[in-house]
Amino acid sequence: MAAALLLLRGLRPGPEPRPRRLWGLLSGRGPGLSSGAGARRPYAARGTPVGPAAAGGHAPQSLLLRILTPSFEGISGLLLKQHIVPNAVRLWPLSGSTLYFNTSRMKQKNKDNDKPKGKTPEDDEEEKRRKEREDQMYRERLRTLFIIALVMSLLNSLSTSGGSISWADFVNEMLAKGEVQRVQVVPESDVVEVYLHPGAVVFGRPRLALMYRMQVANIDKFEEKLRAAEDELNIESKDRIPVSYKRTGFFGNALYALGMTAVGLAILWYVFRLAGMTGREGGFSAFNQLKMARFTIVDGKTGKGVSFQDVAGMHEAKLEVREFVDYLKSPERFLQLGAKVPKGALLLGPPGCGKTLLAKAVATEAQVPFLAMAGPEFVEVIGGLGAARVRSLFKEARARAPCIVYIDEIDAVGKKRSTSMSGFSNTEEEQTLNQLLVEMDGMGTTDHVIVLASTNRADVLDNALMRPGRLDRHVFIDLPTLQERREIFEQHLKGLKLTQPSSFYSQRLAELTPGFSGADIANICNEAALHAAREGHTSVHTFNFEYAVERVIAGTAKKSKILSKEEQRVVAFHESGHALVGWLLEHTEAVMKVSIAPRTNAALGFSQMLPRDQYLFTKEQLFERMCMALGGRAAEAISFSRVTSGAQDDLRKVTRIAYSMVKQFGMAPSIGPVSFPEAQEGLMGIGRRPFSQGLQQMMDHEAKLLVAKAYRHTEKVLLDNLDKLQALANALLEKEVINYEDIEALIGPPPHGPKKMIAPQKWIDAEKERQASGEEEAPAP
């Protein structure tokens, strides 16, 4: 230990530097080290300054230069000859300046950091630059220690640069060819060092390494064995290889081991110190980085983000979240009236409706720090990291107040806490949730930190998270209405090169896509542009949008799937049954298109209807929807006297509608006006039902009666119009795709009056009329 401390003192420049000891370590000549290279030569030109010292260098460098001026041996000489280190004085910067080995400044900075001060953007930048300087300083120290360790390793392994050889290679490739200059025996290790002549050729190639090692079994009889080999090779006495013996000193090996140990410990100390500095939690811990909240800071002042004008639709939601932005921009307008801004808001709604997009707009418009983090990033495998990251996130938010914290997909950490004693609860998630509750509204909660969160599973969130004082404002973002869909289409059509103005497409596309989310609408616009580019068009046309809508609904046509003639007939009658029942009944949607082309979503055909924006349904409307879904199954049974598995999805829809009418809508007279929630699976797949087994049997019976009644009614409609069913099926087998105009020409208009629809043929005719009038250029062929 004393030797290690002595070595470290020699590495640390101070008022009285010790360059002799440093260079002795670098050159490999320490006390007690023996070498066969000869004795140290006396110093020459000791007082003659050269290099940087002659130009007025620093005093430590001048002192080191005066001592290191003579010719060098070992690794130092090799470095100088190869111009890796052009001058010995260059070794001084490698070991670091006096600042790098002085910790007094660091301690003073740490004391300054402990002083309380308010954070401004300038302070944040200054603190960031200071931490970068400190990190750079410790990296320089690590770099210096690595260089010292590398040099010491080179000094120790320089003699082994040629590798090991066998006795046969030594005799046949070296000794017999006269390439050996001398041999040195190391008795303690049973190793023989073979030194070659400069420019020696071994194994047919010139070798740069002039020393090789050879392991010998009986080192005492090596010289005898060597002379016997020379006799066999008829080598004359004057050309015999000289043999010398080398004994390693114990003190030199011990000093080298202590030096490497000291350097290794110093490297480890600096690594842990650097890790402790990097963590914002402070302290000497390498796990501080794991505890840091990995949030994203959104700077709204750059002007590159999403504004409220870029968010189409969602008028009510934008109005509610705009209050947070107005409060952060001008809080005095609210405070003078005694109003308090809500502590947080929860954005709810189906996937793809724009919750995250609205949060991005808030980040841009608020002009305050916006810290965004995803819910799954809180929870890791290591226990306790979730709570630590919550503390880190809110600590940073309070330092930057006024500030907005946004947690996306909060259901990952905000699920309801388990109340059972079964032991299956997730303790890590509950700890994270508890810490989040405390940070949002606890003893140390401060104002001017607003929390935004989004999820599409509000039913699983804990009640304590959604109470007033935490996420007290719930903003529901539902699927867009007709007007909102038109605005969203207008927004996404701005970036496309269209044949007609965007207003020509937006209203029609909005009517074609009821129930579509904003993400679906963006996908339709993108698919239309991709299809136009794939077809080689110079602009996006109407049929490109038709293709995009059809692709999103049913998938793209799969031309590689070829059906047999019999299967094509079954699919044609199946789809004709859907279309005919929907055409003849009163409360069904308009049939826009019927196709028997296979699709990539495993559908062998589809009937495209035009659903209406309808929120209330009568019993008759739901019943006729069941009949329309059963039209394909009934058409198969009537036409072929058998049924296939193609109606699986239709039967699933019919069953769901029937049970909804009985269990939730109260439309079954025998059950009465009661409503039960949908069945949810509990622990181990066992569901809890709020009704008896007898009532369940009654509801099953009522649902079965409804489905049977709908099927009988569907069969009657098809049997009364069997010729029309045959005509539709034949047209499908001939054309593969028929639309509203084709159906009307085949079987006449709907008996209950024209249905609300957007006919693709009329849309195309309208576009052609515009083009004929010269308002826009003609579409590309």
UniProtKB/Swiss-Prot annotation:
The keyword Cytoplasm does not apply. One of its GO terms (cellular component) is axon cytoplasm. Residues 1-43 form a transit peptide. Its cofactor is Zn(2+). One of its GO terms (molecular function) is ATP hydrolysis activity. Its EC number is 3.4.24.-, 3.6.-.-. Residues 106-144, 270-781 are mitochondrial matrix. Residues 22-56, 103-135 are annotated as: Disordered. It catalyses: ATP + H2O = ADP + phosphate + H(+). The active site is at E575. Binds 1 zinc ion per subunit. PANTHER family: ATP-DEPENDENT PROTEASE, PARAPLEGIN. Forms heterohexamers with SPG7 and AFG3L1. The m-AAA protease is either composed of homohexamers of AFG3L2 or heterohexamers of AFG3L1, AFG3L2 and/or SPG7. Component of the mitochondrial permeability transition pore complex (mPTPC), at least composed of SPG7, VDAC1 and PPIF. Interacts with MAIP1. HAMAP family: FtsH (MF_01458). This is Mitochondrial inner membrane m-AAA protease component paraplegin. It comes from Mus musculus (Mouse). The lineage of its organism: Eukaryota, Metazoa, Chordata, Craniata, Vertebrata. The gene is Spg7.
